[in-house]
Structures are given as structure tokens and as C-alpha cells.
């Protein structure tokens, strides 16, 4: 295991329902990456954008080499093949770790999954398969998974994927809510990179914002 190295995987919704939030998503992502460039330790970043299909924007790139995302990278379109994006990313990262030298496997692996709607387009993976994959990686290797959802019951949806209620949160799907998401996720990543426990209150600010501005 390689100490002080963290594998970070972002799975970001770019389906048509994200229309109007492109600038906020791009700005929030870039701000988060800049914060992580300044953090202690090393990090490899993978970014998967999904609609009907998944597009890998970054494949295990050193965080310090990530260039700012632009509107050429992030363009909304299509439906929501969330399960295919999650399953494909877990399969890829898992295989990389499986065949790597033990001393090269990152000390920490963390997934940040963001979606603003229900799964409606996957054809390679179903919720049962993804749940099996996530539960295995959590139990055997200690991987962390955060699930941020809008316009759905995020906790219930995450539970179908094997992600606990303490790692799932509903957010307000607007400019302010999107910006807050990236701030909070960056804080959570920093905790994991420092080997600090990721407490259930990591999502407190998002919870409070959601309840204050129209959530139930």
C-alpha cells in the first residue's frame, strides 16, 4: 500500500436535466480541484461524466496535472445512465488495483457521485450488481462512497446501491446548492487524504441548506 496516496473518483451527471447549471458545475469542480492541489499528500483523479453513455475525462491523473474543466468538456445532454457510470468506474479502478504492485495501491480510495435525477438509461449494470460491487469494495478494501442526489430520495437511492445513509445527502439543485456541494465534497476528500475519520456530519451544511431552501 502506498501511504499518502489517495484515489479520487468523481462521477458527475451531465444529463439534460442539468441544463442551466453548466457554469456552476464547471466552476465548482475547478475550485475543488484547486483546493486539492494545495492539500498534503498525493492524489490521482478520475472523472467520469455520464448521460446515456459515460465519458472518462480524467483517468487516474495526478491532481496537480489536472487542467481546468471547460464548457467543451462539460455539455449537458441525454438521459441518466447512472448505474453504468458507477459500475464501469468501480470495475476499472478495481482492476488497476488488482494488478498493481502492492506497494503502488493507494492508501485511500474515494468515490464522489452526483446526480440530479433517477436512473433511466443503464444497460450494462443493474442496482443489484452495483450494490454487490460497492459492498465488496467497502468491506474488503475500505473504499469510501459519497452520494449526492437532487430531485430524488438520495438516502433511499443510495441504499439500493449499498451506500449507507451517513454517506448520502439530498441537495438543492440550483446554483447555490451546486457550489455548496463541491465545497463540502472537497472538505470530505481532504479529511480522507489526511486519514482522518469521515464523520456522519460531513454533510451537515448541505443538509441544512436543503432543509432551509425548500427541501422536506
What are these language model-derived features?
Residues 1-216:
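Acidic, low-complexity intrinsically disordered regions
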Amino acid at each position: 500500500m502506498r501511504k499518502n496516496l489517495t484515489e479520487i473518483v468523481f462521477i458527475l451527471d451531465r444529463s439534460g436535466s442539468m441544463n442551466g447549471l453548466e457554469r456552476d458545475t464547471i466552476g465548482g469542480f475547478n475550485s475543488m480541484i484547486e483546493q486539492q492541489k494545495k492539500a498534503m499528500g498525493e492524489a490521482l483523479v478520475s472523472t467520469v461524466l455520464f448521460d446515456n453513455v459515460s465519458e472518462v475525462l480524467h483517468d487516474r491523473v495526478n491532481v496537480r496535472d489536472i487542467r481546468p474543466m471547460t464548457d467543451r468538456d462539460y455539455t449537458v445532454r441525454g438521459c441518466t445512465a447512472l448505474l453504468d457510470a458507477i459500475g464501469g468506474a468501480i470495475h476499472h479502478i478495481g482492476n488497476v488495483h488488482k494488478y498493481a504492485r502492492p506497494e503502488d495501491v493507494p492508501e485511500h480510495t474515494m468515490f464522489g457521485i452526483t446526480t440530479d435525477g433517477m436512473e433511466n438509461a443503464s444497460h450494462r449494470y443493474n442496482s443489484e450488481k452495483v450494490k454487490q460491487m460497492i459492498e465488496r469494495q467497502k468491506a474488503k478494501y475500505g473504499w469510501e462512497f459519497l452520494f449526492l442526489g437532487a430531485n430524488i430520495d438520495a438516502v433511499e437511492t443510495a441504499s439500493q446501491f449499498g451506500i449507507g445513509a451517513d454517506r448520502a445527502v439530498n441537495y438543492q439543485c440550483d446554483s447555490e446548492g451546486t457550489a455548496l456541494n463541491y465545497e463540502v465534497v472537497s472538505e470530505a476528500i481532504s479529511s480522507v487524504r489526511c486519514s482522518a475519520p469521515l464523520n456522519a456530519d460531513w454533510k451537515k451544511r448541505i443538509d441544512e441548506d436543503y432543509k432551509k431552501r425548500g427541501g422536506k
